[in-house]
């Protein structure tokens, strides 16, 4: 009996690790969703093209990840976001419809710069042709407090628990997180061996939305 589908989402790339992730996904006949930053595309244009060519999904994570920049106003946020969208569109010939807010839709850091901005942005996303996605399994890899083995154990425990009808894993694609290459290999190897499949966030997937706190 086939087990459930897992949605691996990889934020903040492209980086020098992107091609390695793509190699692993190809090796295990798996798909993922990449939420990319426009400022990282220069020098990695081939990775953006390859993401699409291999059948993965690509979403917009903004041009930059500086909270004090993107969350100063709705106008600035969308200027930043649409700049990144245009870069992706020019490389792939497709207009991305997926997006993920920097820090997620429930972030509270935005309060420092513009009170109530997340309520406005989450309502506005659809008018730009977007569906935004959060996640329900946070690797917390960016904190650098846990080894790849510890993160792997945590993610697998969350999957095996069966509490999520559509598990959406959050990982990051950054040069300072090179242990994530081993982590992704182990995730793909172990879970596909158990009968799980990895697929992309598509339009028929009900998005994970956190409660907006600003």
Per-range role (PLM):
Residues 65-192, 196, 203, 210-212:
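Catalytic domains of cell-wall/extracellular-matrix polysaccharide-remodeling enzymes
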Residues 1-76, 80-95, 189-190, 206:
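Active-site beta->alpha N-cap acidic-glycine motif
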Residues 1-2, 212-214:
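N-terminal secretory targeting signals
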Residues 32, 58, 131-132, 198:
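Hydrophobic beta-strand scaffold residues
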